[in-house]
Amino acid sequence: MAKRFLLLLPLLSSILLLAVSVTAYSTTTPYQGYKPEKFTHLHFYFHDVISGDKPTAVKVAEARPTTTLNVKFGVIMIADDPLTEGPDPSSKEVGRAQGMYASTAMKDIVFTMVFNYVFTAGEFNGSTIAVYGRNDIFSKVRELPIIGGTGAFRFARGYALPKTYKIVGLDAVVEYNVFIWH
């Protein structure tokens, strides 16, 4: 028994010495009081351009055909799409939609969207919102969750209501109404 204790003594001493020598760091900030949340409604147009000499979205991957339908299941697109005040591509740019979308349904045209909407003009210049969700592009009513943000939209939550404004070939203009609590 004493022999066993002598073997364990260096191990126990090392553990005790390590526990004493390790320090933890923690700070506590005093409560500053209740800060009321803001509610913001944003309205802009999203321009997804796949065709032409200067596309804003490009295909980076495509799965082998898995269905006889022409749905393009498994296509992944990367985008840096302009966000503008009006539906015309030459209207004032207010930001960029940077992220990716993937065709994730075998029987319908449905995209899973993963985007940061980066605002480059106006009151929210430099701020972003993070949008993630299912986008069934032929549904009349669509809803995408806002899951976070930066700058003025830090800790943001809310939802976006995209509505297809115009489709020409594979290019689309989508009207967005975004409702954010931050």
From Swiss-Prot:
Keywords: Apoplast, Glycoprotein, Secreted, Signal. Dirigent proteins impart stereoselectivity on the phenoxy radical-coupling reaction, yielding optically active lignans from two molecules of coniferyl alcohol in the biosynthesis of lignans, flavonolignans, and alkaloids and thus plays a central role in plant secondary metabolism. Homodimer. Glycans are attached at N125. It is found in: Secreted, Extracellular space, Apoplast. Its main location: secreted. Gene3D superfamilies: Allene oxide cyclase-like. The keyword Signal applies. Belongs to the plant dirigent protein family. This is Dirigent protein 1.
